[in-house]
Amino acid sequence: RKAKEIAKGAGMVAINAMVATQDYAAAIRTAVEAGVDAVVSGAGLPLELPGIVGTTDVAIAPIVSSGRAAKLILRRWAKEFGRTADFVVIEGCKAGGHLGFAEDDLLAGKCQTLDDILPEVLAEVKPFEAQFGHSIPVFVAGGVYTGADMAHFTAMGAAGVQLATRFITTYECDASQGYKDVLLNAGSEDVRIIHSPVGMPGPVSYTHLT
C-alpha cells in the first residue's frame, strides 16, 4: 500500500514472489488484497500462480531461465487456468539472487547466455500470443549493465530490460550504507556462488560474513 501511495498512479507496482518460500501463496494473496498491479514469480516454477492470484485485474509474469521453462509454465497456465502471462522475465546466469541454473554449470561458466535464451523464449511465447490474442512482452535481466546492453537486447526482440543491483547503491534505496559500500567497492573476484537459505545457488559479493 505504501508503494502504491508513493507511485500515485504513475506506474505499476509489482511484487517478486519466490516459489521456494513457505509463505508464497499467502504473500501473493496479501499483495493482491492490497492492490498490487502485478506479480512476478520465480525461484522455482510458478505453475499455480494464476490460481493463487485469482483475478485477471492483476498482471502475472514468470521468471524463466530457458525456453523450456517458459513453455512448461505457459502450457500449464493455458490448460489449467485458461490464462497466459502478461509478460515474461528472463533471468540470466549473471543475475543476483536465486538462479535457475545448475551450480556446476554456474561455477564452470557453462550456462546459456541471455543471447542464447532470448530467442528460445521469444519462439516459445508466440503460440500463446496467437492463442490468447495479445502480445507477451519479454524482458531480460541479469548482467545488463549499460545502454549498449539495453540496445543490444531490444534489437534482438526484447521488450525491455530489468536492472536491480545497480540501483541498490542509489540514494533512493533504503539499504544500509555499509551494504552499499560493499557493492561499490567489489570487484569481479569478490563474486561467489553460495547456497541461499532456500537451497538454491546464487551469486553474492563475498565478505567475512558470507
Enumerate the predicted regions with their spans:
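Active-site entrance/lid segments in N-terminal catalytic domains of soluble metabolic enzymes
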Residues: R1-Q131
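Short His-Asn-centered micro-motif
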Residues: G42, A141-G142
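Catalytic cores of alpha/beta
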Residues: R68-F81, H134, V144-A159
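C-terminal helical cap(s) of enzyme catalytic domains, especially alpha/beta-barrels
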Residues: A102, L107, T170-G187
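Thr-Gly-centered strand-to-loop micro-motif
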Residues: V140-A141, L163
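Glycine-rich phosphate-binding active-site loops on the catalytic face of alpha/beta enzymes
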Residues: M150-S176
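Conserved small/polar residues in nucleotide/adenosyl-binding loops
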Residues: T207-T210
